[in-house]
């Protein structure tokens, strides 16, 4: 239930929300909420509470493609090449040609939202190409709860 990165030892994100998710029994979450990218229960069985390890691609890095990890990087390879990555038995194929390694052309990110239990983020969507990142939120100046009353609709705890 806790976000972690082997290159950073501190807390990533909202530890309270992550603790709340970690304490929730899996049975309390609907399967479409619990299951996570790449949605291959037979090979991975990853959930929003327990997934990884997962290498996040950087431009120039090369990985070996095999029948186990091709599904993790299929969308990235297809995005970068415009081709189709399939797996025939144990042999990944790009546009029908056997491929055993792939060198990434772009940098990618893996974003997770602060509303850990109900955030449609990379745990569902997969990697985000760097060129899709258009900015960084430095300050939240106004946040509104659409389900609050007129007087209690502002989320003052979110203003930083």
Regions flagged by a language model, labelled:
Residues 1-160:
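Extended hydrophobic leader/signal-anchor segments used for secretion and membrane insertion
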């Amino acid at each position: 239930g806790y976000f972690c990165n082997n290159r950073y030892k501190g807390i990533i994100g909202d530890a309270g929300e992550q603790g709340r998710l970690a304490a929730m029994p899996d049975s309390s979450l609907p399967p479409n909420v619990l299951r996570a990218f790449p949605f291959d229960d037979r090979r991975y069985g990853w959930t929003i509470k327990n997934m990884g390890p997962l290498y996040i691609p950087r431009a120039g890095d090369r990985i070996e493609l095999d029948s186990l990890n091709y599904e993790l990087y299929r969308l990235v390879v297809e995005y970068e090449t415009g081709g189709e990555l399939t797996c025939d038995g144990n042999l990944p194929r790009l546009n029908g040609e056997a491929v055993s390694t792939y060198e990434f052309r772009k940098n990618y990110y893996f974003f997770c939202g602060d509303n850990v239990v109900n955030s449609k983020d990379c745990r569902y969507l997969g990697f985000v190409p760097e060129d899709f990142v258009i900015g960084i939120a430095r300050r939240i100046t106004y946040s509104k709860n659409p389900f609050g009353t007129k007087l209690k609709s502002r989320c003052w705890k979110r203003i930083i």
